[in-house]
């Protein structure tokens, strides 16, 4: 199992409509995405993949959020990693 966490702070609360279009909740066999709101301008998107190969093919959400950052509409940070097995 592999995961990606996309944290963001929006320039304005009105940008939530854009984020909802980008990061709406999805549940598929090998992929799950959840959008969380932590404040008027902040939130995070969690993506869970079956493995790193699936993560490499599912980059649309990450690219769209990075696009908001490049346009100075949001501050975005991204972390990825594998589940630690006991």
Functional labels for PLM-detected ranges:
Residues 1-64, 71-86:
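Short S/T/G/P-rich N-terminal loop/turn motif that feeds into the first structured element of a domain
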